[in-house]
Structures are given as structure tokens and as C-alpha cells.
From Swiss-Prot:
It is an enzyme of class 2 (transferase). It comes from Clostridium kluyveri (strain ATCC 8527 / DSM 555 / NBRC 12016 / NCIMB 10680 / K1). CDD domains: AAK_NAGK-C. This is Acetylglutamate kinase. The record marks 28, 242 as: Transition state stabilizer. Belongs to the acetylglutamate kinase family. ArgB subfamily. Keywords: Amino-acid biosynthesis, Arginine biosynthesis, ATP-binding, Cytoplasm, Kinase, Nucleotide-binding, Transferase. It comes from the Bacteria. Pathway: Amino-acid biosynthesis; L-arginine biosynthesis; N(2)-acetyl-L-ornithine from L-glutamate: step 2/4.
């Protein structure tokens, strides 16, 4: 081990730790980092360390592959329309069971195994996330759009030393349960908390001018420059909704949004605590 190199890395991280200490950061946990056991350990380690240095951390997760896997066991086909899962009554039962009962609790357990304190929540708890059925366009069943975020439970959890781990399920005024897109849920929570940062873990390095060439990664992106990337067809496909979430979050008061590659070991620490970072920062 090169002790000088280790000391140098730790020393260089100091101004970033000071910058984020006491600030709120909301992380969307998903992609390969949620499926690969080794990557999962890297991310959980990062989350616990971030909490230990004084960051007010909130984790939001989906779990699409786990839902699809369970539906397959029930011989029920997963149907997607414009990237959103068609959610009938039976599918909603599975979504709630898998996200809140399995994925959420596994994450809480893992965080605690690394020495962190975590509290598993879903939007139904304390009517934290309110939603209504998406009424425009094609009928998606019990897929909702968020109408309100009650931050009281989230803030109370943070103040008591916990990492709130939130599954993207919401409660309607009609007392129905709604499936919420996890990216959208993350940015809505970040906006409601007026978070310092929103971080989306993905399976791509970030926003790139050429998706086949990692050297074309755009490391910093101003809000005013995004329109040109839309027009040049650089932002397209699966990146579109993620960028839209980042833009809306910043317009709502979040200081910066980051799209990073969850397949990179310790991606969160490298993005936040180094000068170069590893992904795209939008501000």
C-alpha cells in the first residue's frame, strides 16, 4: 500500500467533506448497482460513509427487475407503455410487496450491516407521498403522478440520525395505492427538501455527445445549454426522462443534479469528494 497516496486522497477530499457537511443529498438507487452484489456493497459503503461525515442523506429506490421477476413467477407478463409499467390491481399488489416488503427492507438491512442507521419507508407511510392517477394519454392503470410531498417524516428521520430509504409508492386521496416512476419520485423529494444535490445512479457514464465513445462525456452542463443538446439529438432515449427530472429539480431549488455510472466502484465518493468527479453535473 502506498501510504502517501492514501493520505493525499484523504487530504484532497477534506474541502468537499466540508462543503457537503450538513447539506441534504438525495440519491436515486437503481441500475446494475442494485443488481450486482459487489457493486451493491460499494454503494452501501459510500452511503454509510457519506452519513458518517455529516451529510443528510435520503435514498429513493425503484426495483423494476425484481418486480418483473416476481410477476414472471406468477406467469404474469410485464407490460410497458412509453417506458412505464402498466399496473393493474394484481400488478400493484406485487409492486407494493416487492418494493416495500423485499427491496426496501433488504437495503435497510444492508446499510445497518455496514454500521449505518436506516429507516425503511414508502410513500403511504404518514401519507408522505400523495398522488393521483395519470389521466392524460394511454391508460396505465394504477400509475400515478405526485401531487404533494410531506417532508415531516423524512426530516424527522434525518434529525434522529437515520438514512431514510424510500420506495416509490404513493397514496391517493381516493385511498388507492399508486406506482410512481422512481426517477420522478426522487426529484420530487429532492425539490421538496430543497436538497443541495440530486444524484441518479445509472448504467451509463453520464451525458455523452456520442454514446459509443466514453471520451465524449460532458462533465458539466449548464441549464441554459441543455436545449441545444435536445435539438442536436444528443439527449435522447432513456436519457430524456432523467435529464427532465434533473432540470425540474434545479428549477425547484436543488443546487445541482448528477447523473453517474453506478457500475464504477465507489461512484458516489468519487463524484462528490474529488475535483474531477465521474459523471455529468447539471446546474
Amino acid at each position: 500500500m502506498n501510504y502517501n497516496e492514501v493520505a493525499k486522497i484523504l487530504a484532497e477530499s477534506l474541502p468537499y467533506i466540508q462543503k457537503y457537511r450538513g447539506k441534504t443529498i438525495v440519491v436515486k438507487y437503481g441500475g446494475s448497482a442494485m443488481l450486482d452484489e459487489q457493486l451493491k456493497k460499494y454503494v452501501i459503503n459510500d452511503l454509510v460513509l457519506m452519513k458518517c461525515v455529516g451529510i443528510n442523506l435520503v435514498v429513493v429506490h425503484g426495483g423494476g427487475p425484481f418486480i418483473s421477476s416476481y410477476l414472471k413467477k406468477l406467469n404474469k407478463e410485464s407490460v410497458f407503455i412509453d417506458g412505464l409499467r402498466y399496473t393493474d390491481e394484481e400488478t400493484m399488489d406485487v409492486v407494493q410487496m416487492v418494493l416495500s416488503g423485499k427491496v426496501n427492507k433488504d437495503l435497510v438491512k444492508l446499510i445497518q450491516s455496514y454500521g449505518g442507521k436506516a429507516l425503511g419507508l414508502c410513500g403511504i407511510d404518514g401519507a408522505m407521498i400523495k398522488a393521483e392517477k395519470i389521466s392524460k394519454g394511454v391508460d396505465l392503470g394504477k400509475v400515478g403522478e405526485i401531487t404533494d410531498i410531506n417532508t415531516e417524516i423524512i426530516i424527522s428521520s434525518i434529525d434522529n440520525g437515520y438514512i431514510p430509504v424510500i420506495s416509490s409508492i404513493a397514496l391517493g386521496d381516493d385511498n388507492e395505492t399508486y406506482n410512481i416512476n422512481a426517477d420522478t419520485c426522487t426529484f420530487k423529494i429532492a425539490a421538496a427538501l430543497k436538497a443541495q444535490n440530486l444524484i441518479l445512479l445509472t448504467d451509463v457514464p453520464g451525458v455523452m455527445r456520442d454514446m459509443d465513445d466514453n471520451s465524449t462525456l460532458i462533465s458539466e452542463l449548464r441549464l441554459k445549454d441543455i436545449k441545444a443538446l435536445y435539438e442536436d439529438n444528443i439527449i435522447k432515449g432513456g436519457m430524456l426522462p432523467k435529464i427532465n427530472c434533473c432540470v425540474e429539480a434545479i428549477k425547484s431549488g436543488v443546487k445541482s443534479a448528477h447523473i453517474i455510472d453506478g457500475r464504477v466502484p465507489h461512484c458516489l465518493l468519487v463524484e462528490l469528494f474529488s475535483k474531477e468527479g465521474i459523471g455529468t453535473m447539471i446546474y
